[in-house]
Amino acid sequence: QVFNRMVPVANADNRTGIPFDWQMNVLRSDELNAWAMPGGKMAVYTGMVERLQLTDDEIAAVIGHEMTHALLEHSKKAIGGQVLTGLGGSILAGAVGLDGNLVGVGTDLLATKPFSRHQESEADAGGVRLMAQAGYNPQAAISVWEKMNRAQGGSQVAILSTHPANNTRIEAIRRMLPEVMPIYHQNKR
C-alpha cells in the first residue's frame, strides 16, 4: 500500500529519461536493511519493519530513501555499476548490468563499497521530499533513524563508516522540515 502510493510520485520525479518498472520484494530476514537498484527493483527486509516496528509513515521514509538512490542512479555511479547497498548498513551487491537489470541474484552476490556519504545524504533528502509529496509525514524519517540508533545500541558498525552518522542524518532531516511539512500538509490523506 505505501509502495503503491509512492510509485506515481517517484515516476513524476524520474529525470533519467528511462521509465522505471518499480517492483517491491519483501525478503524474510532479521536484517535491518532495504535496497534498490537502477530501474526500480527494490527490497525491504522483514527485520526492518518488524524489529523497528515501523509505521506506514516510517516505511514511506525507507521506501523514499531507496527510491531516491534508484532515481539518482547511485548504484550505476558506484564502482562499475556493481554496487547495491541498504539503508540499514548491510551491503548486498549483485551483478547489475548498465541497463539496470539484475543478473543472477543469489550465488552471484558479492560485497563492495557502499554508497558515499554524499549519496546517502542525497537519498535522505530526496526520500523525505518523495514521502511528503505522497502524503506521508516527513517527521517519520527522523523516527526511523532514532529507532535505528536504539537497535544499534547507539553504535554504528564499521561498514557504516562511509555513511553519515545517524544523528547527522537526523539533524539534516530536521533542517528540511520547514520545506517539506507544507508539502505533506497539502498532500496528506
Model features per residue range: what roles?
Residues 60-71, 99-113:
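Catalytic-site beta-strand/loop segments enriched in glycine and acidic/polar residues
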Residues 65-66, 123, 165:
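DG-centered beta-turn motif at the end of beta-strands
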Residues 1-81, 129, 133-134, 153, ...:
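Peri-catalytic and regulatory segments of divalent metal-dependent proteins
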Residues 1-18, 101-162, 170, 178-189:
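Short helix/loop segments within enzyme catalytic domains
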Residues 30-32, 48-51, 69, 76-78, ...:
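Solvent-exposed loop/turn segments at secondary-structure junctions
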Residues 75-105, 142-145:
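Post-HEXXH active-site segment of zinc metalloproteases
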